[in-house]
Amino acid sequence: MRIAIDMQGAQTLSAKRGVGRFTVNIAKALARVAEEDEIILVLNGAFEASVRSLRDDFHGILPQENIKVWQLHFDTKAIDPANRNLIKAAEYLREEFINQIDADIILVPNLQEGWLDSAVTSIGRLPTKSKVCSILYDLAPLIYKEELLNNIIGNWYYEKLDLTKRSDAIFTVSWSTKRDISELLHIPKENIFVLYCAIDRNQFKPITIPDGESYQLLSKYSIKQGFLMYAGGADKNKNLPRLIEAFSLLSPSLRKDHQLVFVGGCLSEETNLRDLAMKCNLEYNDLIFTGHVSDQDLPALYNLCSAFILPSFHEGFGIPPLEAMACGAAVIASNAASLPEVIDCPDALFDPYDITAIAGKIRRVISDEQFRSDLQQYGLKRSQAKEFTWENSARTALEVFKTIVPERISAANGKEEQTVGLDKLLQAIPSIGAQFNDEELFKIALSIGESFRPRNCEKLYIDVSSIAVQDHATGIQRVTRAIALQLLADQEITCNLVYSTPTIESFYLADNVEARLNNTIIAKADRNDQLVEFYDGDILLFLDLHPALAITHASYLQKLRNRGVRVFYVVYDLLPVHFPQYFVPLLRTEFIEWLDVVFQSDGAFCISKTVAEDLSRYCRENAINPSTNFRIDWFHLSADFMSSAPSLGFLPDAKHVLSLLSSRPTFLMVGTIEPRKRHAQTLAAFEQIWAKGIDANFCIAGRQGWLMEDFIEKLRAHPERGRHLFWLNGISDEYLEKVYDASTCLIVPSEDEGFGLPLVEAARHKLSIIARDIPVFREVASGHAFYFNGLEPEALSSAIQDWMKLREEGRAPSSEGIPSLTWKESAAQLKQILFRPHDCVKV
């Protein structure tokens, strides 16, 4: 079976109450026990924060693709009568979205949502072949309608009850509530099924709390002595006024040693309850109102209380007593509704309408040590009963599902019906009869457009924002062009290039870039390019490095992730982190902010295992809390730029320069001239070599970078320039290939790199390599390079001369063993980790 679960009960204000906990826990249990069945969670995109938290909560339980989000961009709060027609439009939208899932079962854990927010629930607005099951927790508002319902909310509540009657099966949480539903709603008992609530036994259990910690916790809530604890809301059915009156009947000596502590959502009624307490001659400190407490504090309070009490005259189930018993608390409760079947101990119960009886039970549990101990031991045993497990309830639900689901309709027929259903949705909204204004029509259209994706067209979008605006032909942009070209040519995936700017939130198709990439002519961004519509299942890959764009788009990218779009970044290095002295402060700050954005994505793909391990270490050392789904992976680059979008052309003196390079041993440095690449050290080393009369060339192929003005001035004015010293500034890939062919040895003295493309380029041209001994160069070149250490010119000068001796003796390491990928192979590695994670680095 395919089971779709509407998770709105875990997204609204109900999330912090029993409904929310039930929704999440039954969904998790179904996912655990449904071995041959598929569980799909359906979320309302109007609740953005909850979408992210629920995706995180179900990480490792369900695949992310099993979490579907429909979008709602207009107000549907039922408390506002003006929203009535918008609510109907949203109901059509939600039902058709769920119909598209093609589920056998649609489980709605709470139909009574949407009064104060944009939750939307309905049954039967559109035809469906799915069976719809709902959960009704209690009928307290109906049973006590004079106290709990007013005319405004009453009509809405009755509409929701009518929806419940349309369910193919109704679940509830106790046999008591089942009787109420059958008798009051006139529903056959055979259509109503009991799913007991359960608790997290890893959270609610007896614990030993050191005196210091217990004192600190109790002081936090102004609890100064033993205390009688209540947990829950302040609804009328909770019977809190009678509890206060009963507490006031205790002797002063008992009250002196015990406070009455209200834990949870009672703050709204605190003033009224304190007024009552004053009339009952209670002191201010006799009553404590904690408000909502953390998931850590609640079990601790259960463990520390003298006793727990639930005086309700009506409960659908009664989770707090079960939690308290599991923590070893002595529990006393009302003998009304579901509580006798939950607690199952007549001696612990009292008449909720009899204040004297309530006071008597409180007095006994506080003063009778044996009675209290018996209740504690009994409660521990009762809370462990098999029926109070989520797995048991989930298996019960599955059995019910199997009895009401007919033979599965073929997938082909299902898809055909879905297409018709979407047409019906588009026809149904105008037929509501509302005169929607232009803004409302736009928001309805936007909601439909973002909720329903074209089928079978998951796409890979590659961000090329930097080269779409201006291609500086940096190493990263060379990689971007080469990888993008290969992925565009891959027939197994649908790939598009996209761009944006820091001032525009949306992304646009980079049509001009894509169209001209094969000719290596990168067009400037065309503002008439088509706006990208992202859908569930799409991937957005930031292949280019554009920190400002990622930072300004952080919020928008989280919205995309909420909708099921996966966002990944390629990380080339962490140089600004490790060598801040070589970067302007603003750039380093921006890079750190960019890393923060990266860690909130779905993953980082590094261009070497060294960088991947470095990124993981950075995350740990800086106590960064990445997104739940975040993973670090790595792939290797190619260096064959001539086979993939190379830049072309020669400078006028190229022939002469190449002749000079070929005339004597030439040592080549390739890359942008930056401080950490150690050009200054290398030039000083060659000045020592030339001073010894050694006839050798030093050639630099690379553009001027930042913080190198003094070096560039020296380079331009150097007496050996044009004789033994050459600077080839911004030459094409085609020209660089010829320079490699004319050179003897590659020198790579950089203090750090993300990969080291020149190493692989040199190997392709069978050039020997002298490289600094750093981890990434060992990863790329292994034993196929001559390594050196030291930051002084003498260290490199000595290494060059040692290598020259080895070369004369025929013992210099050969670079020919360095693995060399094609760009197609490099792109294939990236594609594999995009779609099939393998050797992930642990964070």
Feature-to-residue mapping (PLM):
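Carbohydrate transferase catalytic cores enriched for Leloir-type hexosyltransferases
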Residues: 1-843
